[in-house]
């Protein structure tokens, strides 16, 4: 059935309906036509608003206003990452060629001294007052367990400018062997890492040092195993 025939059928049906209903039916048909026209006009207007983006941007703008704190925080994080830090920082590594001693180097890969920190006489010199994260790690190695009890020690000391006395800030003790040595343990290799870290109030001119014992058990075979550093907070 074609569209023209459908329209003709509708017109004939409306004409027959109007003849049977009289003036009252004609009035009802007029109200029905007006309601249909308003419905079609409203749907067309809504489609145009959606199609031309009149409604969409308002919703997006409202959504952006609702999430403005999150967007501001993300923008602040991105901006702060572009600002270079002027806080003192140091990260020194052990000299792999210094057998039997712990010698710190800053002119190596992954090592640095920045914003006033100095490495002097194997000690880190604090450039300004403030809170600092102080940390260090060492790795010991050995072969088997001797008859005597073995202790491995690692400590970080501070020599303050205010009282010129050496004071331990951090220290740790480990033993690679049990008190009762199991059978066959005298031939097994062992490795023992010790990590130290803490936050301290330091003064300008303070000197920090890291010591170990026994030095001949220090493992310097790989880079990144033995290090010492401070970070201003």
Curated annotation (Swiss-Prot):
GO terms for molecular function: cytokine activity; tumor necrosis factor receptor binding. Its main location: membrane. GO terms for cellular component: cell surface; extracellular space; plasma membrane. CDD domains: TNF. The soluble form derives from the membrane form by proteolytic processing. The membrane-bound form is further proteolytically processed by SPPL2A or SPPL2B through regulated intramembrane proteolysis producing TNF intracellular domains (ICD1 and ICD2) released in the cytosol and TNF C-domain 1 and C-domain 2 secreted into the extracellular space. The membrane form, but not the soluble form, is phosphorylated on serine residues. Dephosphorylation of the membrane form occurs by binding to soluble TNFRSF1A/TNFR1. PROSITE patterns: THD_1, THD_2. The chain crosses the membrane at residues 33-55. SMART domains: TNF (SM00207). The record marks 33-34, 38-39, 48-51, 76-77 as: Cleavage. Glycans are attached at residue 80. Residues 1-32 are cytoplasmic. It is found in: Cell membrane. Homotrimer. Interacts with SPPL2B. Cytokine that binds to TNFRSF1A/TNFR1 and TNFRSF1B/TNFBR. It is mainly secreted by macrophages and can induce cell death of certain tumor cell lines. It is potent pyrogen causing fever by direct action or by stimulation of interleukin-1 secretion and is implicated in the induction of cachexia, Under certain conditions it can stimulate cell proliferation and induce cell differentiation. Induces insulin resistance in adipocytes via inhibition of insulin-induced IRS1 tyrosine phosphorylation and insulin-induced glucose uptake. The TNF intracellular domain (ICD) form induces IL12 production in dendritic cells. This is Tumor necrosis factor. It comes from Saimiri sciureus. The lineage of its organism: Eukaryota, Metazoa, Chordata, Craniata, Vertebrata. The gene is TNF.
